Curated annotation (Swiss-Prot):
Residues 1-20 form the signal peptide. A motif (MIDAS-like motif) lies at residues 261-265. InterPro entries: Compl_C2_B, Peptidase_S1_PA, Peptidase_S1_PA_chymotrypsin, Peptidase_S1A, Sushi/SCR/CCP_sf, Sushi_SCR_CCP_dom, Trypsin_dom, TRYPSIN_HIS. Its cofactor is Mg(2+); Mn(2+). Residues 255-453 form the VWFA domain. This is Complement C2. It comes from Bos taurus. Cleaved and activated by different proteases depending on the complement pathway to generate complement C2a and serine protease complement C2b chains. Cleaved and activated by C1S following activation by the classical complement system. Cleaved and activated by MASP2 following activation by the lectin complement system. Cleaved and activated by GZMK following activation by the GZMK complement system. Disulfide bonds join C24-C65, C51-C84, C89-C131, C117-C144, C151-C191, C177-C204, C464-C582, C493-C509, C585-C601, C639-C666, C676-C706.
Length: 750
């Protein structure tokens, strides 16, 4: 062997002579901002810049430490010095039939634009708009219109130029953006028969602009709402513009395709947020009574099909969530590219295979609706144009003007600088009054979107057990079934909407008030205009209820059969503040629990009261949701025996079952909250699969924690006083409920 080669072969054996591990230079500070590293200074690490609100990183938001120990050089710029630049909003290029001020080349964050119309024209949209820290104007496009055409004046968004000034049937308008701005929405729109413009509004935005979570969440939240709102052909034919997003008849079927970017620029932590966001969407969709199949595709240089809609397990929420949870970040470890085309092409192949299945009925195939959710952090850089794959998908689904509602593509980009607005816009669906393409600043914003998107305000049918669980929802929105029952102006009891016209409450609320025409039921949030008072058309009190029935036995009060139904004089309009809760043993609850057809009331009880201690809730006087633990089985016995020790209330009681029968659920241990006087009749409820079910109603207790004047102040029980609370168990009063709610609710077999 050559002596020199021999020496070289031995070099790795000596630590002092070993090659040093590569690392990227540390001179990457950003002026005015900060940065984070996904894996230190090692090759493969992603550097992410961040700037204060109202500023953006320039020239890039991320950089990759390459395998040669050098930072990736930003494309399309010679500058490698990172700085935080101030955000600016674009200026109007033109404004028809009116004037605007001030006239600047661009506008700083916080700056205002004011619009005013000429005589004979009416202003539609926002008269004053403010530049927001994300580079977007708040409000809506200002338009001066005289209403003289078949379609309304489509307007000209800030920074846009329009060609076409005729708005009659069949007329077209075209848009382009001024220099350095990016067009999102439809570049061309046509005036249609129904007086609505095709496509979606053209908006011109700065390349570095992004969407706030509070803007994206309502759009996606409405998607879920209208997925449920289209419940039958009659409702579909209504001409109300409800902003239909992902839409499906409950008798139909939805194919949901989740496409998750796993390319090298996505860190492991960020990919976990992608997975978590997809899981939230899946969980929410499966919480409603619709038929859905889910496909999961991850992609980098190549796609990987985790789950196909052709598989039976794609219709099982547990299987879908397990598949999402078990996706391995390292599956695409060697994939450096972002191949959105191949990911969408995999969806196309899946659709084609389903359509050509031997047993697939052509009519049934035509009725399947399809929604594609793309989560990506970058521009497609290999595999060809993703738009080609979208066109193929539209062809196989026969998407035309009449069938446009059968396909929705949502393109969600994360990272305002390295996501291509133009590409996302080309991929997202274009439908009037809707948005399907979004860019969020970072994955944390994406997570916020899926936390806040659960808005049910647009659901017009009385689907049960749906509460708005987003972080910014009011107390009433979280428990929209909760109502207040009062004679004249004094509040005395609570109740729960169980349909759009019936309220379930406690019988003892009415023992001292015979003239029920004076009573009112307040539905909705008293802090909002949506609150409304209803008169009672009919009160159905359980004939078995008589609070003094055991007085001769030395028992001053007995609350057996403490249940009542109230029929309101009018139906309640469904909204985010007013919606019924699910009553167990009904068909609605069976669907919400995802139980099979043929399931029984006993099956519901096993599902909902399946432990000896069950976390549950009731609503306090101030609207807060408070926590209790319902006791069953052996724990029920231990819970109720405390009554024997309360000699103040029951001085001569020897058998606890004389006052606490098996009609009652028991709570009050484990530091539970205790209901106050005035909270009687309210629902005792629990959550399963993002839906809410009433298993009991507040009846009576040994201690009133609200003895003071303030309804916001709850005092702990004094020394020697053991609190216990008892709630009517709705599973024990099924015959009575079925007798009086027949034809109002559909019940499953006992």
């Amino acid at each position: 062997m050559d002596p020199l080669m021999a020496v070289l072969c031995l070099l790795p054996l000596y630590p002092g002579l070993a090659t040093a591990a590569l690392s990227c230079p540390k001179n990457v500070n950003i002026s005015g901002g900060s940065f984070t590293l996904s894996n230190g200074w090692n090759p493969g690490s992603i550097l992410t810049y961040s700037c204060p609100l109202g500023h953006y990183p320039y020239p890039v938001v991320t950089r990759l430490c390459k395998s040669n120990g050098q930072w990736q050089i930003p494309r399309s710029t010679r500058s490698t010095k990172a700085i935080c630049k101030p955000v600016r909003c674009p200026a109007p290029v033109s404004f028809e039939n009116g004037v605007y001020i001030p006239r600047l080349g661009s506008h700083p964050v916080g700056g205002n634009l004011s619009f005013e119309c000429e005589d004979g024209f009416t202003l539609r949209g926002s008269a004053v708009r403010q530049c927001r820290p994300n580079g977007m104007w708040d409000g809506e496009t200002a338009v001066c219109d005289n209403g003289a055409s078949h379609c309304p004046n489509p307007g000209i968004s800030v920074g846009a130029v329009r060609t076409g000034s005729r708005f009659g049937l069949g007329d077209k308008v075209r848009y382009r953006c001024s220099s350095n701005l990016v067009l999102t929405g439809s570049a061309e729109r046509e005036c249609q028969d129904d007086g609505v413009w095709s496509g979606t509004e053209a908006i011109c935005r700065q390349p570095y602009s992004y969407d706030f979570p509070e803007d994206v969440a309502p759009a996606l939240g409405t998607s879920f709402s209208h997925l449920l709102a289209t419940t039958n052909p009659i409702q579909q034919k209504k001409k109300q513009n409800l902003g239909r997003k992902i839409q499906i008849q409950r008798s139909g079927h939805l194919n949901l395709y989740l496409l998750l970017d796993a390319s090298q620029s996505v860190s492991k932590d960020d990919f976990e947020i992608f997975k978590d966001s997809a899981s939230r969407m899946v969980d929410r969709i499966f919480s409603f009574e619709i038929k859905v199949s889910v496909a999961i595709i991850t992609f980098a240089s190549k796609p990987k099909i985790i789950m196909s809609v052709l598989e039976d397990r794609s219709r099982d929420v547990t299987e879908v969530e397990n598949s999402l949870r078990n996706i391995n970040y390292k599956d695409h470890e060697n994939g450096t590219g972002t191949n959105i085309y191949e990911a969408l092409h995999a969806v196309y192949i899946m659709m084609n295979n389903q359509m050509n299945r031997p047993h697939m009925n052509p009519g049934a195939w035509q009725e399947i609706r399809h929604a594609i959710i793309l989560l990506t952090d970058g521009k497609s850089n290999m595999g060809g144009s993703p738009k080609v794959a979208v066109d193929n998908i539209k062809e196989v689904l026969n998407i035309n003007q009449k069938r446009k509602d059968y396909l929705d593509i949502y393109a969600i980009g994360v990272g305002s600088l390295h996501v291509d607005w133009k590409e996302l816009n080309n991929l997202g669906s274009k439908k009037d009054g809707e948005r399907h393409a979004f860019i969020l600043k970072d994955v944390q914003a994406l997570s916020q979107v899926f936390e806040h998107m659960l808005d049910v305000s647009q659901l017009t049918d009385p689907i049960c057990g749906v509460g708005n669980m987003s972080a910014n929802a009011s107390a009433q929105e979280r428990t929209p079934w909760h109502v207040t029952i009062k004679p004249k102006s004094q509040e005395t009891c609570r109740g729960a909407l169980i349909s759009d016209q019936w309220v379930l409450t406690a019988a003892h609320c009415f023992r001292n008030a015979e003239d029920r025409t004076l009573w009112r039921v307040s539905v909705g949030d008293p802090n909002f205009q949506g609150s409304k008072e209803f008169q009672i058309e009919e009160a159905v009190i359980s004939p078995g209820f008589n609070v003094f029935s055991k007085k001769s036995q030395g028992i001053p009060e007995f609350y057996g059969d403490d249940i009542a139904l109230l029929k309101l004089t009018q139906k309640v309009k469904m909204s985010t503040h007013a919606r019924p809760i699910c009553l167990p043993c009904t068909v609605g609850a069976n669907l919400a629990l995802r139980k099979l057809p043929g399931s029984t009331c006993r099956d519901h009880e096993k599902e909902l009261l399946n432990q000896v201690s069950i976390p549950a809730h009731f609503v306090a006087l101030n609207g807060d949701k408070l926590n209790i633990n319902l006791k069953t089985g052996s724990e029920w016995t231990n819970c109720v025996k405390v009554v024997l020790k309360d000699k103040t209330t029951f001085p001569n009681l020897t058998d606890v079952r004389e006052v606490v029968t098996d009609q009652f659920l028991c709570s009050g241990t484990q530091g539970d909250d205790s209901p106050c006087k005035g909270e009687s009749g309210g629902a005792v409820f629990l959550e399963r699969r993002l839906r809410f079910f009433q298993v009991g109603l507040v009846s009576w207790g040994l201690y009133n924690p609200c003895g003071g004047s303030s309804k916001n102040s709850r005092k702990p029980a004094p020394h020697g006083k053991v609190p216990r609370d008892f709630h009517i168990n709705l599973f024990r009063l099924q015959p009575w409920l079925r007798q009086h709610l027949e034809g109002i609710l559909n019940f499953v077999p006992l």
